[in-house]
A protein has these predicted regions:
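Periplasm-facing N-terminal accessory domains of Gram-negative outer-membrane beta-barrel systems
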Residues: 24-137, 152, 171, 193, ...
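Transmembrane beta-barrel wall of Gram-negative outer-membrane proteins
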Residues: 256-283, 294-336, 354-371, 434-438, ...
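Conserved C-terminal beta-signal and adjacent last beta-strands/turns
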Residues: 319, 668-785
Length: 785
């Protein structure tokens, strides 16, 4: 049955490929003169000719933005299909003076440009830029792009909160989690091209401080065969690149709930070497969303909820030639917090300590012609990575036991967890452009994970209960090959196939072959239309809590079943349009069928989590993005998504006392299902002053109520009786920059939940209930040297 399904999908892919290829005959492809031309450029430092990655490129005509691009790791950029005419190409990079050149495009032309940027003596250019919203849309791929320099969120905001406010279809969830397109934390970080595997299930420690980020590109669909693992979203992070001479930035903030934090980052550029170093700490009396509230007014009661976070990050970049770039990065983060609890159910003075760290080494080497997209050229990327994580959940000796291992309802237990892991891996990719129309890419990613998992329980007398103490060992391997074929400028066909193998305790060797195909049409520079199909294989973390789940289900075989990788069929169609007035609009629809699906289950009253399987998961959604950059002091963006994520059992491998899938009709909305998620942000900037406002709306996550009748499974079936009420909050910020000699001083004020709205964020379902945070104020001062 499985083989016939795969063959059927491959036939569908081949049919799409054949239809696309038949649309343009070889003679037409060779003879037709392309409409418009390409702009290809290189951006260098004027003092040492070093490449300048991440520089922002804008093509304008008559004051209107025609296209945007950014420089890659070698300082190169390309803009395809620019209509014939005269344009101004502008380049901007923090730490350098802006530069621009005039260019004239003819049909079929390919213009090569070189920019030599001059370092600025101060950061003065940051004081006079026009307003920029932090989110942009790539009109060719449809991906959203986040720029840290344009972000005006509260200093205590985490990387996860930035993801939620940046990605269309992302839902705000408790403990800083983010649910993307109805899926539960199934996203993968890539830091400067090197993958960073996910941490321990239940970890609330952020991987890195947002201040180390330069830009992030989010890919929530249309994945090439290169991308495997947890790819509900590929979070492609480019960390800050040292530019110019020595720079240092200091910041400090304080605010509501005894919140305070300090940070420092420094960078320098010495010849072909660049260095960046960052460190920060923060402390707050409200580390997580409160779990207590007045049931009549929904006013949150903040109790036993303090925490501290520490981050360090260092990066060295070496560019020995215009063909080679080496990046070495190291990151360490540590979190300690008290676990909130409801005192009505007894005292549980529990603490959680977490550590996350990674070290990456990446090398890129270019072959062939460096400054032309028409000639044969290639690129080799080799990355090595190390990932460490640990989680210690420690109950107090005086805790009142409160957890029961079903079906025993007479002996309560306290829960203790000590877990750690180490992952070693490599990623190697080779890309070869045969000519302007055809490009191939192939590669492999492999990693080995080892660790130890010590999970135990004790009753009120101190006697040991069920436990699991075992070594962990497993590995993941992924191999792929893909191509991009552009017979004419208005058509691109991307096809590929990947093979994944996942070995984890009790799961054995799980593997899959996954075909993928994306067909894109570019009628002109302002319009993009694409369709996509991809087979997905999403493995779980290499962990083992089966000994505990066996007892928690009273020996039920559903709990002893290993949690297996998620297997998906994913379909997507999208359209992107750039309007003349500086507005970009994206409309996207998607459908995902999973068998099995993956979720996670939390032990009540703790943060201890294990992955679980659902026999089937269905996700349907439509989302739209509007980016507004008309020129002048205002800019903004709107993310709006309507999404339905639901599943059916059996649910295997969790801590459930009853079968949550045993409901009328069999289907139930998942605990991370929220029908409507929307974010709207507006930024005003005039000279040295800025002000911003961001509204966040959610129609409501599940409330944990019993399902008494079959739910609606349509996209517009809101199933309000099993969801909390909708919520809408507004966050605001304002600041002013002062120039004192060569030093920039920027005082800023941030207010989250300006109108102090009271609402339930989520009810108890797969995990506990949480209430929304009350109004908070934070004041921050940045000093840039």
């Amino acid at each position: 049955m499985r083989v016939s399904c795969i063959v059927g999908r491959l036939r569908s892919c081949l049919l799409i490929i054949g239809l696309a290829a038949s649309a343009v005959t070889p003679r037409e492809a060779l003879a037709a003169t392309p409409a418009g031309g390409d702009i290809v450029g290189a951006i260098r430092d004027s003092t040492n000719a070093a490449p300048l990655p991440n520089a922002e490129v804008g093509v304008t005509q008559g004051g209107r933005i025609i296209a945007n691009a950014s420089a890659d790791q070698f300082g190169h950029f390309v803009v395809h299909g620019v209509p014939a005419g005269s344009y101004i190409v502008q380049v901007r990079l923090i730490g350098y003076k802006p530069d621009s050149q005039t260019v004239k495009i003819a049909d079929g032309s390919r213009i090569n440009m070189t920019f030599q940027l001059v370092a600025s003596a101060t950061q003065l250019e940051q004081l006079t830029v026009t307003a920029e919203a932090p989110i942009a849309v790539d009109t060719r791929s449809g991906n959203q792009v986040y720029k840290q320099n344009d972000y005006h969120g509260a200093p205590s905001n985490t990387t996860s909160q930035i993801l939620q406010q940046s990605i269309a279809g992302a839902a705000r969830a408790p403990t800083g989690e983010v649910h993307i397109r109805g899926q539960h934390a199934e996203y993968q970080y890539y830091v400067d091209g090197v993958p960073v595997p996910s941490g321990i299930s239940g970890s609330l420690n952020e991987l890195f401080d947002p201040s180390v980020v330069d830009r992030i590109e989010f890919q929530t669909g249309g994945w090439d065969a290169e991308f495997g693992n947890k790819n509900a979203a590929v979070v492609d992070v480019r960390t800050r690149i040292p530019t110019g001479g020595f720079h240092m930035n200091l910041d400090g903030y304080g605010g509501s709930n005894s919140t305070d934090g300090q940070g420092i980052n420094m960078s320098d550029n010495i010849g072909k070497w660049g260095f960046f170093l960052s460190g920060s700490r923060q402390e707050t009396g409200m580390r997580q969303e409160p779990v207590l509230f007045d049931t009549a007014t929904l006013k949150p009661i903040n109790f036993h909820n303090s925490g501290q976070d520490y981050f360090t990050f260092g990066k060295a970049q070496f560019a020995p030639s215009d063909r080679d770039v080496f990046d070495f990065e190291g990151n360490y983060s540590h979190t300690h917090f008290l676990v909130p609890f409801d005192s009505a159910n007894g005292i549980t003075n529990d603490h959680q300590n977490e550590v996350n760290s990674f070290a990456n080494l990446g090398w890129r080497h270019r072959f062939g012609n460096l400054d032309s997209t028409s000639a044969s050229s290639g690129e080799l990327f080799t990355g090595f990575y190390y990932r460490h994580g640990s989680l210690a959940y420690v109950p107090n000796v005086d805790d009142e036991p409160g957890f029961f291992f079903f079906p025993d309802t007479t002996t309560p237990y306290n829960i203790n967890e000590q877990r750690n892991f180490d992952t070693y891996g490599t990623k190697v990719d080779f890309q070869w452009r045969v000519n302007h129309a055809l490009e191939f890419k192939t590669g492999v990613q492999a990693s080995v994970t080892t660790g130890r998992e010590d999970f135990n329980s004790t009753d009120s007398t101190g006697a040991a209960g069920p436990g699991s103490n075992s070594d962990l060992k497993g590995h993941d391997i992924g191999v792929y090959i893909q191509d991009a074929y552009t017979p004419v400028e208005w058509l691109e066909l991307r096809t590929g196939v990947r093979y994944d193998a996942h070995v984890a305790p009790f799961a054995g060797n799980q593997h899959q072959v996954s075909p993928r195909v994306k067909l894109s049409f570019f009628p002109d520079l302002s319009n993009t239309f694409y369709v996509y199909y991809g087979r997905q294989f999403i493995p779980t973390n290499i962990e083992d809590l089966r000994a505990i789940t066996t007892v928690s289900e009273g020996g039920d075989t559903t709990s002893t079943s290993p949690t297996l990788p998620e297997r998906d069929d994913f379909y997507e169609v999208g359209y992107v349009h750039r309007f003349p007035a500086g507005i970009v609009w994206k409309l996207d629809g998607y459908l995902k069928n999973s068998s099995p699906g993956i979720d996670d289950n939390t032990i009540p009253g703790t943060a201890i989590v294990t992955s679980v399987n659902l026999a089937q998961v269905r996700v349907r959604g439509i989302e739209t993005v509007i980016e507004v950059r008309p020129g002048g002091p205002l800019s903004g963006y709107v993310n709006f998504a309507i999404n339905h994520a639901y599943g059916r059992g059996p649910v295997t491998g969790g801590f459930f006392q009853t079968d949550v899938a045993n409901v009328p009709g069999g289907w139930f909305d998942l605990d991370h299902d929220q029908r409507i998620s929307s974010v709207a942000s507006l930024v005003y900037s005039k000279s040295r002053f800025f002000a911003s406002a961001t509204g966040i709306y959610g129609s409501g996550l599940t409330n944990g109520a019993d399902i008494t009748q079959p739910i609606g499974t349509g996209l517009f079936d809101f199933n309000k009786d099993i969801h909390v009420d909708p919520s809408f909050i507004v966050n605001g910020a304002l600041g002013y920059s002062l120039l004192i000699g060569n030093t920039v001083v920027r005082p800023q004020l941030f207010v989250d939940n300006i109108f102090d709205k009271r609402y339930l964020l989520k009810g108890a379902f797969f995990s506990g209930a949480s209430v929304g945070r009350p109004r908070t104020l934070e004041a921050r001062v940045d000093i840039g040297i």
